[in-house]
Amino acid sequence: MILKFCGIKTKVEALSIRPLNINMVGFIHYPKSKRHLDIEQINKLSRLLPDEIDRVVVLVNPTLQLIKKIINATNINAIQLHGDETIDFIKQLRLNFKNIKIIKALPATQNIINDINQFKEHIDLFIIDTPSEQYGGTGQSFDWTLLKGLDQSIPFLIAGGIDVDKIKQIETLKLNHLGYDISSSIETDGMKDKNKMLTVIQQVKGEL
């Protein structure tokens, strides 16, 4: 399964993650987030990670100009859109940045299947998260049974306060998810905790 650890903020965190058996690391570029990093910070931290780990920048309603600036100035290879981006915008993104993976976060609502169908031709991976009036993660869970209608043709990760106990619950539902996007539950006092990360990896992948 795919594991994405999101909200990396420091060199210490990046170095602790570098040897771990995970697939994606998220850097947040959104000033309203407590995990916000500027472009130079993202550049430095993204270059500490091996090529086998996707380096994802998380953005909210960005411009194409901002995305181009980040791509040119950092070592990221994936964009995660966490706002109200339109299909036309994503088409432009795909046209301009052919080698960049595009990830779209969507809220888990009764309309989730329709929402995914609108975007799926242009998106490499979806992240299904808890609905919120604010942009970004909430650390709260949602009704995972909403995802039972998503078949294997839809590549998606589950987010929203995911921890080891919730992973165990989700696995009993036999969903078609590819993995998990995790942030707050692998932190202690606001910093990524290596022991908590290893516990999640052991649960999801069965090996460290």
Curated annotation (Swiss-Prot):
Question: Which pathway does the UniProt entry assign to this protein?
Answer: Amino-acid biosynthesis; L-tryptophan biosynthesis; L-tryptophan from chorismate: step 3/5
**CDD domains recorded for this chain?**
PRAI
Q: Name one GO biological process term.
A: L-tryptophan biosynthetic process
Q: Which reaction does it catalyse?
A: N-(5-phospho-beta-D-ribosyl)anthranilate = 1-(2-carboxyphenylamino)-1-deoxy-D-ribulose 5-phosphate
Enzyme Commission no: 5.3.1.24
> GO MF annotations for this entry?
phosphoribosylanthranilate isomerase activity
Q: What class of enzyme is it?
A: isomerase
Keywords per UniProt: Amino-acid biosynthesis, Aromatic amino acid biosynthesis, Isomerase, Tryptophan biosynthesis
Pfam families associated with the record: PRAI
Q: Organism's domain of life?
A: Bacteria
What the record says about family reads: Belongs to the TrpF family.
The record's PANTHER family line, in alphabetical order, gives: N-(5'-PHOSPHORIBOSYL)ANTHRANILATE ISOMERASE
Q: Give the protein name, as stated in the record.
A: N-(5'-phosphoribosyl)anthranilate isomerase
